[in-house]
Amino acid sequence: TYRLTYIEEDLEDSQKNKENLSLSIPLKTIDGLIKIMKLIDEEKIVVKSDGSKVFFKFSNVEILTRTIDLQFPDYKSILNNSQHNKKILLNTKDFLSVLRRTAIFVRDNKEAKNGGIFNFSNNKLLLTGTSENAQIKEEIVTIQEGGDLKISLNVRFLLDYISTIEGKVTVLELLNNKSSVIVKDEDNDKSLYFTMPLA
């Protein structure tokens, strides 16, 4: 399974420098940046690159990392070709709590590491997670448009993105149990998350 996160932000220097910057950065570097930025109360970050390395500066922290020779995916084509006929609205806080509890059980699941079964039916989500010795079932209320659906998704992947959502409502757009899922903050059209179901 794979995932893609798209975030659009306005840059202060974007008017001065019209040149586009497209870089692939190691995931470990991004994870490190996120962890450090959560500890520091700083909203401004300086990013510079010569193409082979990227320099980040914020507060009194400086990070230099290499870039990866990997073409950025054509996310617009992926999103434009994604078809969805089901829309699920969930309370972000409740959904996050359910995902966190389920993640404890599914992290060592031998059949599908971090895999949970998401059953959307009658304006409810029943989330089931299984470990070697135990099973958890969590149910929360949803607003559901379209038919019922049962799908297996990576709980950890969802948790990583949904923990960044600031709005009260999380939106899931789905088609079937083999097609892509789009996750977004109802109040933020500049960020969305794309993931595939588990086999």
Identify the function of each model-found stretch.
Residues T1-Y6, S14-I68, Q83-A199:
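DNA polymerase processivity clamps
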Residues Q71:
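Feature marks short, surface-exposed loop/turn motifs that line or immediately flank catalytic pockets
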Residues Y75-S77:
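Specificity-determining recognition surfaces
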